Amino acid sequence: MKEINYAEVLVVLTNVDHYQGTTDLTGLWLGEAAEFVDEMTQAGIEVDYVSPQGGFVPLDPRSMKYADSAILKIYESADFKKRALTASLAPQDVNPADYSAIYYTGGHGVMWDFQIILNFRK
């Protein structure tokens, strides 16, 4: 059983890669995750990443236009690329009670994921 670390936060991401009913791309708004992760890291708080399906998390290509140096620093880190964007945890792999907080990222992709994501509250 995992030891509870009350200084650990679960970051909820999206798996949706296009607007429903269209071919227009969407996904995680990078700043929604990266700015939060940067703040947590600076405070010495660890984060884990989960998405409704686990695995790959697409980025909204429009979000890259607004990425500043702090956002890019997180984006370019090996840890973020692996644990957030490539191999996010699936809901069945986490116990929300193990976390002191759950942070739900914003962006357009989560509009279609939210029904699945809301199950974390149960």
How would you describe each model-predicted region?
Residues 1-122:
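Extended, subdomain-level signal for the structured scaffold at the beginning of enzyme domains
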